[in-house]
Swiss-Prot record:
GO terms for molecular function: cysteine-type endopeptidase activity; metal ion binding. It is found in: Cytoplasm; Nucleus. In epimastigotes, the unprocessed enzyme appears to be the main form. Auto-processing is dispensable for catalytic activity towards small oligopeptide substrates. This is Metacaspase-3. One of its GO terms (cellular component) is cytoplasm. Its main location: cytoplasm.
Amino acid sequence: MGFDFGCLLKLCSTVLKPGGAPGPINYMEIGLNLIKIAAPYIVQYLGIMERPPRVDVEEFFQQAEVTEGFKPWEAPTHVSGTFRALFIGINYYCTSAELSGCCNDVKQIIATLQRKRIPIDEMSILVDERGFPGANGLPTRDNIVRYMAWLFGGAKPGDVLFMHYSGHGTHTRATSDTEEKFDQCLAPVDFSTKGCILDNDIFRILLSGLLQGVRLTVVFDCCHSGSMLDLPYTFVGSRSLRRSVAGHMQRIRKGNDCAGDVLMISGCADEQTSADVSNAATFGTGASGAGGAATQCLAYTILKVSNLSYQDMLIATRDMLRRKGFTQVPQLSASKPINLQQKFSLMTTFEVDPAVAT
């Protein structure tokens, strides 16, 4: 697949900069007034990719020390620590891998967090859409790794971290993972020339040194994302599981434990594709235009329903996708066996289910 960086730069008005928003930005208004500019609903599959080069993690942590985000809005402070967030949306303009709604997903999820008055202290945005308000740069391989290092860097007990990715996910043949035949990958905007980002490297950046008392939530709205973080515990329950039936977490992987409280919500299982819809307004979030099905369902669930448990949140998202005719099944995995009846939150640490074998 060819990649015309010149074409992309013509479409994008944002280049890499240290950070800082050009004044207050009303993301709620943006999220509620998305203009339909994209192609009809289509699922694209990149296929099995060549194994990418490994990431020099230490180099990017050094770069992250001089990387900054910005405070997007005023909200009651998260008193126990700092709330830091990273948003990545990639439409792959001017390539055969072009998608239509990934940057809209970023607008929608930010608008959702603003409407819920989530107290974000520092935020960074990587998108390839021209004129995206507050964007820090393009979602190149180097930038994504650098900003993931920024997100994690210096996190201490009481801090809250959030990351949302919407774009292509793919996989490559595993070389050392004895439990899986494939490693999952994120596809940056320049993946055809620079390579993808392995799940092993994402784990090394975000999770390997995470301290106890740090809360991290990661949302992947992309194909083959069910085990993108290689977390040890996952939600167990059939696609048709009802809210009245108690589900549970189960250890599916030995090793890859981390001290922090990590929740991953993915758009689909490893073997599935994640859909891009042409009319997000049908999901009732107030948005119009193209957007990822899983992102729209999650945003709707967070906005419209209060006091959901972790299990209820996942089942509500799955049910909405099923009613809309999608076959993908969103997944929930974690660093610890969460008590799934605990109230869903982006900020609190987990209650552990003592019945789950560790």
